[in-house]
Amino acid sequence: MKVGQLVVLVDEVDGLEAGREGCIMGVRDDMLTVGCQTSERLHLVLAHTWQVLPRELFRRLSAREGREL
């Protein structure tokens, strides 16, 4: 994963629900700083690498399971 990559949270992280899209703002070891926009403001959350998926992979997996995004 790299800075600027679009990702989707697959777990609830710091009060933001799973399925929320964000952009990687920073990477350090197995931790990511992810910026997620809500209607009120930009939330920066600290997530483990296993708590997010690249957006395109998430969409492909969701389509395979028959879910609409």
Language-model regions: role of each:
Residues 3-59, 63-66:
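Basic/aromatic-rich interaction segments and small domains that mediate binding to polyanionic partners
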